[in-house]
A protein has these predicted regions:
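Short, surface-exposed beta-strand/turn modules with glycine/proline-rich turns
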Residues: 60-69
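Long, contiguous amphipathic alpha-helices that act as assembly "spine/axial" helices in icosahedral shell
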Residues: 1-61, 81-108, 224-232
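Proteins with a high burden of low-complexity, intrinsically disordered sequence enriched in S/T/G/P/A and R
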Residues: 1-2, 64, 78-82, 139-146
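Low-complexity, compositionally biased segments
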Residues: 17, 46, 50, 62, ...
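Charge-rich, low-complexity amphipathic helices
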Residues: 33, 40-48, 115, 125, ...
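Sequence/fold signature of self-assembling virion shell proteins
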Residues: 68-71, 75, 119-251
Length: 251
């Protein structure tokens, strides 16, 4: 069984790598836009190998974006009232949409759990030295019919030459409140290889991702080399932006 799995890994490893790279780029665009007020920028960091440049915007309404009353910084950890900022978002949205989740980075969760006022909110002033965990905050939120917090930990790898650089697309300073259900769609078009396939290339499909496999070197008697590529003419589109709210925790 182990030999079989290793053989499958050798045969499918390159294909899985390039397919995952396409999924990673789609996640990067979606999570980047979702956590940056509906905007995503193609630049040297997000697209170092060139091609598409510029930015896209899904037009989050200005009234859906709020800044914290006090910056969520280490200097303010004993005075900042995280829930006051959260309550302001809930108040602003209550007549427009039913929010289900608050998406945020692990660092924002850790900060909330360590603040003095959050400990007092969860445990009371007499037990404010007791540690607060995410499940404690979410128990409080669920009890009061508020959206629960969900950490975003996605890391993608961006190809830059021969190096794959880890990149976190989520803006760790923002908390994004979303309604239940799907937030958008992935729009697709036919790729070039679907419209005009090349000779000597083997193609396969994974959903709307097309992989290409070809070899060089055999005819010339030189070293045989195989190449694998994945291609997808796709763009994630956030369709529910009018019901999505952003809290900027660092003013």
């Amino acid at each position: 069984e182990d030999k079989k799995n290793r053989l499958i890994s050798i045969m499918m490893g390159d294909i899985q790598t390039v397919v995952n790279a396409v999924y990673g780029k789609l996640d990067m665009i979606f999570l980047g836009a979702l956590s940056n007020e509906g905007k995503f920028v193609f630049d040297e960091t997000t697209n170092p190998e060139g091609g598409v440049k510029g930015s896209i915007s899904f037009n989050q309404p200005g009234e859906n974006i709020a800044s914290c009353k006090t910056a969520w910084t280490l200097e303010n950890i004993d005075t900042v009232d995280c829930f006051e900022d959260i309550q302001a978002i809930l108040d602003a949205s209550q007549d427009k949409v039913a929010l289900a989740k608050a998406l945020l980075s692990p660092s924002r969760i850790s900060y909330m759990c360590r603040t003095k006022k959050m400990k007092q909110l969860i445990w009371g002033a007499d037990k404010s030295s007791k540690p607060v965990l995410l499940r404690d905050i979410n128990d409080f939120m669920e009890t009061n019919n508020y959206p629960v917090f969900e950490p975003i930990r996605r890391i993608v790898r961006i190809q830059k030459g021969r190096e794959a650089i880890p990149y976190a697309p989520w803006n760790q300073d923002n908390i994004v409140f979303v309604p239940a259900g799907e937030l958008g769609v992935v729009k697709n078009a036919y790729s070039d290889c679907e419209l005009k396939p090349d000779e000597g290339v083997s193609y396969s499909k994974y959903g709307r991702i097309v992989t290409s496999l070809w070899s060089v070197g055999q005819k010339e008697g030189s070293k045989h080399t195989e190449y694998t590529k994945a291609e997808s003419q796709s763009l994630p589109v956030i369709t529910e932006m009018n019901g999505i709210y952003t809290l900027k925790t660092v003013a």
